[in-house]
Structures are given as structure tokens and as C-alpha cells.
Regions:
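Aromatic-lined carbohydrate-binding/catalytic grooves of carbohydrate-active enzymes
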Residues: 1-13
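Structural preference for beta-strand elements that scaffold enzyme active sites
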Residues: 28-32, 76, 104-107, 183-187, ...
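Substrate-binding cleft of secreted/luminal carbohydrate-active enzymes
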Residues: 213-231, 235-236, 242-343
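Active-site beta-loop-alpha junctions enriched in small/polar residues
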Residues: 36-38, 110-113, 191-193, 222, ...
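Conserved, mostly hydrophobic/aromatic
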Residues: 24, 90, 97, 106-109, ...
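Aromatic- and acidic-residue-enriched segments that line the glycan-binding/catalytic groove
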Residues: 2-5, 39-72, 110-148
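Active-site-adjacent "subsite" loops/lids of carbohydrate-active enzymes
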Residues: 10, 17, 21-22, 32-100
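Glycoside hydrolase catalytic-domain groove-lining segments
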Residues: 127-256
């Protein structure tokens, strides 16, 4: 792929993906490639890679023509998701990974447009000329979408048109994965505000689930408070039902207290979520709150098992019951009567 060079800053010429897969499989871990779709980094990074000067028109622009999204992490650049060349480039990257590496899954992050600008303009994205022309052709109108009143019927159509751009790309990824290896797991990271993401970042994970394109949905329910991730998890579970697996994204990168993170994990389990995901791996092990040690001593003291791996799940359940018989119920055996009396 001529437009992309190997990133040598972190590991030189070492093939980190191959290393993760090989070593992870030695430890019995699944390795899923975490990809970012149309988000290609910050302006400084992107200028040196695929958004070079001759490809500047590939960038997605907001209603004022701005082609990046400034925030505390830099100025984010998204490719135009309607542009066929951009879509084909990304799909070709995924094909290369899926055909040449023994991956267990593909995790779609940033599967959306950029969020609106945070300045006083609140400008939303998707105003490239080809996107506008496509919208006008589909709805047989010459209206300029910049003039649409929020909440009007045509504004809703404009939002839906951009949503369908993302929906159709998810379908293309799904078709690619199933063509190469139907056993590869497809998951996605979704914004937590289910009600509004279809009209702000044009992301509608419920559509993907309903069409059978997702094996698992991961909600980015990040909060330092106890209740929000649990309540958000319940909302997603009602929306997804039994059509896909669902895991709650918990924050290990911020100021969440250790005991709160443990309680969030336990709470999500108790309301029936299939699992939790900690963002991110590095934070989980490096955080000053000692997250990793606390997790392995409590909620993750036993080895995890995937809920979709039936044989391993049944064995894990039997092992857990056997352990309880020894550690807990054994206390009530006649020979331990004295111990029981001492703790009454």
C-alpha cells in the first residue's frame, strides 16, 4: 500500500502485530486487531502519512470547511468516508491483515464521522462536495445542507444520509471478513449516547446488530462514578437484546478509584452484561491505583473464559463450583464444626 509507511518510532522494524498474535496464542489469548477506520491520527502524524498535500482533499470537512477536529489530544483528522478511494484504501489494509496474520477478531473503533467541533460553531462534519452531491441526488433536491434547520424533515434526511455512509461501510467490512474467514470475530466501539449518536456522529450500532454484522458491541461508558457504566450497560442490553454479545467499556485511564472500578465491574456482571472492557491495557497495569492487582485478587481471580466458547464455559462453571465446594461449603462439613463455631 503505497500511501502508508511502516511506523518505526515505537518498535523499529519489528512486526508488533505478528509478535502480539504469536505470543498471545502461546498464552491462550485471543488477539483482535483494534483498527480506527477513517480516523487517521492528528495533523502532524497524518501529514507524514496518508494525508499528504496531494491527498488533502481526502480529509472530511465540517460545515465551515475545516478539515480537522482540535481537542486535548491534538487535531484529529478523518478521511472522507464517502470517497471510494478512501474506503478501498482502508478495506485493502484490513484485507492485508486478515490474509497475512492469524487474527481472532477485528475491532472497529472510530466507526463514525468526527464529533462536532467543540468551539462556538459546534460545526458538524460531512460537508465535502461529493457527500453533498450524493445527498442532493438521493433526495432529488438542490438544498444546501448548511441551511437546514435542526430538527426539520430534510435535516433528518441529511443526518440519515451520513449515517448510511457509515452503515454501508460496516457492511463492506463484514462482507470482507466473512469472505476471508467466517470465524473471525467482528466488534465495534460505540458512543454511549444511543439516542443521539445517529444525528451527531452518524453512528447507529443498532442497525449493524439488526443486520447481523456485529458479533459484539462495546460501549464506551467511561465514568469515574459508580452508577453510570452500569446504567448505560442496561440501556445497551435492552437495545441489543440477544442479537449480539455486549461488553461495557470501563475507564482505566482517568481518575476512577480502584474500589469503584471493581464495583463497576461487579455491577455490570450482576445486571447481565456479557463482559467488560478496560480502556486501556497499558492504563490497567500502570495506574497508580493498582487496578491490575486488585482485579486479579477479586473479580478476575479465576481465568476468564469466552461466553461463546460453550465447552470451555461449561468447564469453567464446573471448576468454579468445585472450588466453592472446597473453599466455601467445606467449612460446613462436620469435621469443621469447631471452625464454624469460632466464626459465629
Amino acid at each position: 500500500i503505497e500511501l502508508i509507511s511502516h511506523n518505526t518510532q515505537a518498535h523499529g522494524d519489528y512486526d508488533a502485530l505478528e509478535g502480539f498474535i504469536r505470543i498471545g496464542h502461546e498464552y491462550g489469548l485471543e488477539i483482535h486487531a483494534w483498527v480506527e477506520n477513517f480516523f487517521i491520527g492528528t495533523t502532524g502524524q497524518s501529514d507524514a502519512l496518508i494525508a499528504e498535500s496531494e491527498k488533502r482533499d481526502w480529509r472530511c470537512i465540517d460545515r465551515n470547511g475545516v478539515d480537522n477536529f482540535p481537542n486535548e489530544y491534538g487535531s484529529f483528522v478523518f478521511l472522507n468516508p464517502y470517497n471510494r478511494e478512501c474506503r478501498d484504501l482502508i478495506l485493502e489494509i484490513y484485507r492485508e491483515m486478515l490474509e497475512n496474520y492469524d487474527l481472532d477478531g477485528l475491532h472497529l473503533d472510530y466507526i463514525r464521522f468526527s464529533e462536532p467541533q467543540r468551539d462556538e460553531t459546534k460545526a458538524d462534519f460531512g460537508y465535502n462536495a461529493d457527500i453533498i452531491a450524493g445527498f442532493q441526488a438521493q433526495y432529488d433536491t438542490d438544498v444546501d445542507p448548511r441551511t437546514l434547520a435542526s430538527g426539520s424533515e430534510m435535516w433528518r434526511n441529511w443526518c440519515k444520509f451520513r449515517e448510511e455512509i457509515i452503515n454501508s461501510f460496516v457492511k463492506e467490512v463484514y462482507d470482507l471478513v466473512r469472505e476471508i474467514n467466517p470465524e473471525i470475530w467482528i466488534s465495534c466501539a460505540c458512543g454511549p449516547d444511543l439516542a443521539n449518536t445517529p444525528t451527531t456522529i452518524y453512528q447507529n450500532c443498532r442497525d449493524w446488530v439488526a443486520n447481523g454484522w456485529m458479533d459484539e458491541v462495546f460501549s464506551m461508558s467511561y465514568s469515574a462514578g459508580l452508577n453510570y457504566p452500569i446504567e448505560n450497560g442496561q440501556l445497551f442490553m435492552r437495545a441489543i437484546g440477544d442479537d449480539a454479545f455486549y461488553s461495557v467499556g470501563l475507564s482505566a485511564f482517568g481518575t476512577t478509584e480502584r474500589d469503584v472500578l471493581l464495583a463497576q465491574t461487579d455491577g455490570c456482571y450482576r445486571v447481565g452484561c456479557n463482559g467488560v472492557n478496560f480502556f486501556s491495557w497499558g492504563s490497567l497495569f500502570q495506574h497508580e491505583e493498582g487496578y491490575e492487582a486488585a482485579q486479579t485478587a477479586s473479580v478476575y481471580r479465576d481465568k476468564a473464559v469466552q461466553t461463546y466458547a460453550l465447552n470451555r464455559m461449561l468447564k469453567a462453571g464446573a471448576d468454579a463450583l468445585s472450588g466453592k465446594l472446597e473453599r466455601v461449603y467445606g467449612v460446613f462439613a462436620p469435621e469443621n464444626a469447631a471452625l464454624y463455631e469460632a466464626h459465629k
